[in-house]
UniProtKB/Swiss-Prot annotation:
Pathway note: Nucleotide-sugar biosynthesis; UDP-N-acetyl-alpha-D-glucosamine biosynthesis; N-acetyl-alpha-D-glucosamine 1-phosphate from alpha-D-glucosamine 6-phosphate (route I): step 1/2
This protein's GO CC annotations: endoplasmic reticulum membrane
Residues given in the record as substrate binding sites: S43, K93, F94, L95, R96, E105, D106, V107, Y136, K137
Chain residues that bind acetyl-CoA: G115, R116, G117, L118, G119, L120, Y150, A151, K152
Biological process terms in GO annotation: UDP-N-acetylglucosamine biosynthetic process
Compartments reported by the entry: Endoplasmic reticulum membrane
UniProt EC number: 2.3.1.4
Name recorded for this polypeptide: Probable glucosamine 6-phosphate N-acetyltransferase 2
Function: Acetyltransferase involved in UDP-N-acetylglucosamine (UDP-GlcNAc) biosynthesis. UDP-GlcNAc is an essential metabolite that serves as an initial sugar donor of N-glycan synthesis and thus plays an important role in protein and lipid glycosylation.
Length: 166
């Protein structure tokens, strides 16, 4: 999870949104800031010990810019917690001359922080990163209830998702 340019500076973010929430890459210390608990608001997510989190973080960090996890955090808050997150996985293809596709996954905003535009900011930044990485498209799967939300993020409905779970 190598560094890319972060979202606009805190001052710019405050001017744009009226809050000091920053969008940045996941850090190894985010376990203590409730990252795993936030993911459990999206889907079943067993609690990880600090060492399990560190091992998973190291594995994902080794993928570099092909696997980017962003988080939203308000460093001005008395108790800094992760308020939102989203992930971008970049897939290399033989199609389109070895093109790349960005997959947006695991987007969730803490229930207490919803309605503040944090998910939109995370998703838009993930799309920017995909574009910077040379992806020819960005795709995601969502429930029917979230179609309108992702349409606000610029996505259009295409196709049908099918899955096999193990």
């Amino acid at each position: 999870m190598a560094s890319t340019s972060p979202e606009p500076s805190t001052a710019a973010a405050v001017a744009e949104t009226g809050c000091s929430v920053q969008i940045r890459r996941l850090e190894a210390t985010d376990h203590e800031k409730g990252f795993v608990a936030l993911l459990s608001q999206l889907s079943a997510c067993p609690d990880l010990t600090a060492s399990e989190f560190a091992a998973c973080f190291a594995d994902l960090a080794a993928l570099g810019d092909d696997h980017v996890i962003l988080v939203a955090e308000d460093p001005a808050a008395p108790e800094s917690r992760i308020l939102a997150t989203g992930c971008l996985f970049v897939e290399r293809k033989f199609l389109r001359g070895g093109g790349k596709v960005g997959h947006v996954e695991d987007v969730v905003v803490d229930a207490a922080a919803r309605g503040r535009g944090l998910g939109l900011r995370v998703v838009r930044r993930l799309v920017e990163i995909a574009k910077e990485a040379g992806c020819y498209k960005v795709i995601l799967d969502c429930t029917p209830e979230l179609r309108a939300y992702y349409a606000k993020c610029g996505f259009v409905e295409k196709g049908v998702q099918m899955a096999i779970y193990f």
